[in-house]
Amino acid sequence: MSQYNGGKSYFSFQWHITDECDQRCKHCYIFSGEGCKELKSMTWNQMKEVVANCEDFCKVYNRIPYFYITGGDPILHPDFWKLMVLLKLKNIPFTLMGNPFHLDDEICRMLKACGCDKYQMSLDGMRETHDWFRKPGSFDLTIEKIGCLNRAGIKSVIMSTVSKTNMNEIPDIIDEVVKAKVKVFAFSRYVPTGGEVDTSMTPQEYRKLLEICDAKYKAYEKAGCETYFNKKDHLWTLYEYETGQFKLPENAEKGMIYGGCNCGNCHITISSNGDVMACRRVTDSKVANVFEDRLADVWICQMEKYRNYDRFEKCSKCELKAWCRGCPAVANGTSGNFYAPDPQCWKTRNEITGEELLMESSLTVSLENRAGLR
């Protein structure tokens, strides 16, 4: 097993405290597939149990807990404010990932007083497209509430989910978030779950999008804009490697993992029913239940299968394995195989060894298996 050397003192827990939500987004993994048969929320005692289990984990591994609290919309949980006070008393930092509908200046000031570091909302297109994905009026309200967050001193974060459906609108979204003085902007790719979202984005189309966004980012940074552009997708590493913006460190140790996907490294997801998942976007990645299992034990047992880096069919042969590995969630959603090639990765050759990376046959078999053709 490769060692991980992220050099991070924080360990992140993405925590879904409720499924309750004001929207039914077309790309939401909670309502994908057969749909969410029952909206679940944790009880107050269960939430205290989760905090204690996460604190125990961090004590064992000498980390600091950092919660990404989400749902649904977490603010709809009946004990939301009790949780905010608990985290404040324990001095545990957190980000909220929710909707704009229940935010105003007073609520944002209260969140800031409880220690809220960042508040993440979504923009998945310009007005018509975003409101189609989410609900009418969502776009304008999201833009409006950025100001509430900024005035309260909470870092406003906008995340976009990219697919073939909206990829051509991402550059316009960048302009919009800069104009609104968003503090952080990032995008990640849609994980196929069925439904009305077009998933046919080709590797070269996605690379072109990164090229366009990179030019925009540089222009805005040069102009001194307030927005920080977080290059969240790990295929940014491949793009920057090709364009000379990322160099392989000369002192990198063989077998070490320095970056790339955090699944199995410094991240755990806890769902509203207590299920512990390696990644929320990998729908079949349940490894335990937070009410039945000690997270510190799960980490060295059940989570181990997500740290077998030599199993990556394409990435294991690539010189960027220690820094990239694409998005296994997208690979899994496309082919049903966590270790399959990332469908938007355009790299075909190891530039150091000359070895071919493209594994058409393996990817084809995975796709045919998923479609029931084999």
Feature locations, PLM:
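Conserved C-terminal portion of the radical SAM core fold
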Residues: 16, 54-69, 88-95, 116-120, ...
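C-terminal accessory region of radical SAM enzymes
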Residues: 205-250, 275-326
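Radical SAM enzyme core and accessory elements
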Residues: 1-7, 255, 271-275, 279, ...
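Conserved radical SAM core fold
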Residues: 34-35, 74-76, 100-105, 118-136, ...
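Short glycine-enriched, charge-decorated loop/helix-capping segments at active-site entrances
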Residues: 34-41, 132-138, 199-203, 333
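Conserved alpha-helical substructure of the radical SAM core
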Residues: 1-117
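Short, small/polar residue-rich loop motifs at catalytic or cofactor-binding pockets
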Residues: 261-265
